[in-house]
Amino acid sequence: GCSSSEILGEHIGKGSSPETGVVVAEAILKVLNENGIYLAAQCCEHLNRALVVERAAAEKYMLDEVCVRPMPKAGGSFATAVYDRMSDPVMVEHVKAHAGMDIGCTLIGMHLKDVAVPLRLSVKKIGDALVTAAYTRPKLIGGVRAHYPE
């Protein structure tokens, strides 16, 4: 999730910047594509926090497609830029991601697997936006007698 408004020091959703969305989208897509990692870009609450993903990811993970296209004022500038730059984008309602990054307090937790572990990053802000991240781990089950691999 990414708020271009927050990056620019505005209240989330109040200063959407397509130019900022493009810069962030291109930087993130470059790194993820080089490492074979699929991006799920979260839209704003006007699109119920739907996500932009590559069709290949939607098919691989059996995600249900929804019919909408993000725009800067309905979905957000970042999601719009990602949609415009993916080779075959589709929109989905839900994912259960292994990890996530939140730029500007966009509340990505609903799209992570159940046990999220905070990840401390060296970069705390992008522009004026707070940056938080998490990875996930399997649930520990079994109680006091259970043993877990290291």
Q: For the regions a protein language model found, what residue spans apply to each?
A:
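N-terminal intrinsically disordered, cationic/polar leader segments
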Residues: E54, P72, G76, S122-I126
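A glycine-rich helix N-cap at a beta->alpha junction
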Residues: Y61-D88
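Long, hydrophobic N-terminal alpha-helical segment
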Residues: G1-Y38
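Generic secondary-structure signature for well-ordered alpha-helical cores
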Residues: L29-I37, Y83-M91, T136
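Glycine-rich, aromatic-bearing surface loops/beta-hairpins
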Residues: D84, M91-E150
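Short internal beta-strands
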Residues: L39-C43
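Short, catalytically relevant binding-site loops at active-site mouths
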Residues: S4-E6, E45-R49
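Short glycine/threonine-rich loop-to-helix capping motif typified by GTGT followed
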Residues: G9-E19, A50-L63, C67
